[in-house]
Swiss-Prot record:
PANTHER family: HISTIDINE BIOSYNTHESIS BIFUNCTIONAL PROTEIN, HISTIDINE BIOSYNTHESIS BIFUNCTIONAL PROTEIN HISIE
Annotated organism of origin: Bacillus cereus (strain AH187)
GO terms under biological process: L-histidine biosynthetic process
Protein name: Phosphoribosyl-AMP cyclohydrolase
Ligand binding (Zn(2+)): C72, C88, C95
Keywords for the protein's UniProt record, in alphabetical order: Amino-acid biosynthesis, Cytoplasm, Histidine biosynthesis, Hydrolase, Magnesium, Metal-binding, Zinc
Length: 101
């Protein structure tokens, strides 16, 4: 089973392997997906820069991919990782650190 990239980018929800905590949300195009499979490190597509980026390439806060899951429509991906350092560019463990309710 493969993701359906016919509509463009797919959301990639990144979760920590042990805790299942949601670390971040990013987007993958087909090239980012293939690089993630090949390197076992997360690659994403930046919508603002219109280019690929490798999580942790500059910060050292890398994500080692343990498994990938597709949803039932094949248009969203869950990436299970072993996170090294914080996942958020702000230095927080997760990008979802603002509690609303």
């Amino acid at each position: 089973m493969k993701p359906n990239f016919s509509k463009g980018l797919l959301p990639a929800i990144v979760i920590e392997e042990g805790t299942k905590e949601v670390l971040m949300l990013a987007y993958m195009n087909e090239e980012a997906y293939e690089k993630t499979l090949k390197t076992k490190r997360t690659w994403f597509y930046s919508r603002s820069r219109r280019s690929l980026w490798n999580k942790g390439e500059t910060s050292g806060n890398v994500q080692h991919v343990q498994s990938l899951y597709l949803d039932c429509d094949q248009d969203a991906i869950v990436v299970v990782v072993k996170q090294v350092g914080p996942a958020c560019h702000t230095g927080e463990k997760t990008c979802f650190h603002y509690k609303i309710i």
